[in-house]
Amino acid sequence: RPIYLTFDLDWFDPSIMPGTGTPEPGGYLWRDFAAIVEVLKSHNLIGADVVELSPKLDNTGISSILAAKVIRSLIMLLDKSS
């Protein structure tokens, strides 16, 4: 069955994703996202979008870097040749 994924960045803990409009204390870490990516490898992911990045709320830039890593991981999942 085809899967379209909307990934909300406020799922991450504010310690690694402060640049979101609705931070979630006690949120998840990168390793948790990596585990989801591993599960998705065996499913039919046909598209994805990433939401809730607000770079103005993060003067360190770490949120934009993490968002780019998430997008890269999802693109790699969508690339059936990889």
What are these regions (language model features)?
Residues R1-S82:
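Catalytic cores of soluble, metal-dependent hydrolases
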